């Protein structure tokens, strides 16, 4: 099986998480600057097969698009353009940053460590990926780009 990659998009950093090859476990992978993400992914895909991408979709508590939605859409379009054969799924990312912080707190991470935004972004991406894996298993995953749509 191929891996699945998930992204927690931010204008300063993109948190990235990956499944294991059997798609059982979600692991924090890395953080990259948005301008470096395509090069990073091309290198990664040269060494690891990837079945799908998952992008955290920013929503407000009222279930409306957040102020970062336009940036995330631009990121999705960048991925579509550069990796047109890879499907993209969307997952509601509300509360992932606070869940990541709580995870760090429960894990005994020091106060200094909890201030590391790159770590929070990686953990947020992992939470997004775990949510997707649950949705995929119960048939509720939302595909936002199919490779067949590449020519649309």
Swiss-Prot record:
Record's keyword terms, sorted: Cytoplasm, Hydrolase, Nuclease, Ribosome biogenesis
SMART domains: YqgFc
Alphabetical list of InterPro entries matching this protein: RNaseH-like_sf, YqgF, YqgF/RNaseH-like_dom, YqgF/RNaseH-like_dom_sf
Protein known as: Putative pre-16S rRNA nuclease
Superkingdom field: Bacteria
Pfam families: RuvX
Record function comment: Could be a nuclease involved in processing of the 5'-end of pre-16S rRNA.
GO annotation terms (biological process): rRNA 5'-end processing
